[in-house]
Amino acid sequence: MKFSKLSITLAVILTQAVFVLCGMKNEDFMEKGLESNELHDAIKKPVNSGKPDTERLLDCVLSRVCSSDANCCGLTPTCKMGLCVPKVGGLLGGLLGGIL
C-alpha cells in the first residue's frame, strides 16, 4: 500500500495534535485532581428523589406496568391498558393504538 507524502504528513500532524490535547487534559487533572473531573461533579450533585438515577432508570426501563402516564418514563411516555407504550403518531401510531 502506497501512501503519499501529504497523507503521512497529515497523519503525523493529527497525531501530534491529539497528544497535545491529551497532555493539556492531563495537566489540568494533575493540578486540580478529581475536583476538575466532570464525573466527580455529577456524583456529588444531590439527587432530588429517594432513588439514585440508575435505580430510577432501571425501574423505568424494566417496569412496563403503569396506572397513569406519570408512572411511565420518557422512552415510553403513554400508559395504555396498564402498560407503558411509546407515543407514536401517524398511521403506525393509529395501528399500534388500535391493537393495544
Swiss-Prot record:
Q: In which tissues is it expressed?
A: Expressed by the venom gland.
Pro-peptide positions on chain: 24-55
- Record's InterPro entries? Omega_atracotoxin_CS2 (IPR013139), Toxin_23 (IPR012628)
Signal peptide range in chain numbering:
1-23
GO (cellular component) term, any one: extracellular region
Pfam families membership: Toxin_23
What keyword terms does UniProt attach to this protein? Calcium channel impairing toxin, Disulfide bond, Ion channel impairing toxin, Knottin, Neurotoxin, Secreted, Signal, Toxin, Voltage-gated calcium channel impairing toxin
Q: Which cysteines are joined by disulfide bonds?
A: 60-73, 66-79, 72-84
Subcellular localization is given as: Secreted
Gene Ontology molecular-function annotations: calcium channel regulator activity; sodium channel inhibitor activity; toxin activity
Main location class:
secreted
Coiled-coil stretches, from where to where?
A: none
Record SUPFAM superfamilies = omega toxin-like (SSF57059)
The record's section on PROSITE patterns has: OMEGA_ACTX_2 (PS60017)
This protein's superkingdom? Eukaryota
The domain section of the record reads:
The presence of a 'disulfide through disulfide knot' structurally defines this protein as a knottin.
Job of this protein: Potent inhibitor of insect, but not mammalian, voltage-gated calcium channels (Cav).
Q: Which family does it belong to?
A: Belongs to the neurotoxin 15 family. 02 (omega-actx) subfamily.
> What is the protein name stated in its UniProt record?
Omega-hexatoxin-Asp2b
